Amino acid sequence: MKNNNIFLWVGLIILALVLIFVAKNNGPTGDNFVKSVLISEETFWDFKTISMADGNVSHDFVLKNNGSEPIKITKIQTSCMCTNANLLTNDGKVKGPFGMHESPPVNLEIMPNESVKLQAIFDPNAHGPAGVGVMDRSIYIDTNSSEKPKLELKFVANVIK
């Protein structure tokens, strides 16, 4: 009976050590984080009343690295399938589209005091003919900032037929 208890305790200790090792190696390390913060002076946009017949609407938010170190955008996701986002880089490239589900990796590094544009695109027809009324949507941006790792941009639209 004592041998069984010893094996049980040794097994539990080994399991705990393995779990600790895996948790430490799967999470981001302190070297991956920076003190810089990604900001947007405008975090909300009102499209006002839009017609389904007019199709998609878009708005550009300006994202700025407000720190002294390069910051990396790691992920962009939207709150609904009716919303997509594109990153418009300073060299004229477009990264995206980023949506609600599987999106391409971002991995865009923004230098200190540099800005990029995030284009929010809303499809008023995505919910079909019954999708009228006020729609609130969000775009979530993940970064490697230790101070503020997430930025949320929001918009609202009153959809009519």
Positions of predicted regions on the chain:
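Feature for long, exposed domains in two main contexts
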Residues: 2-161
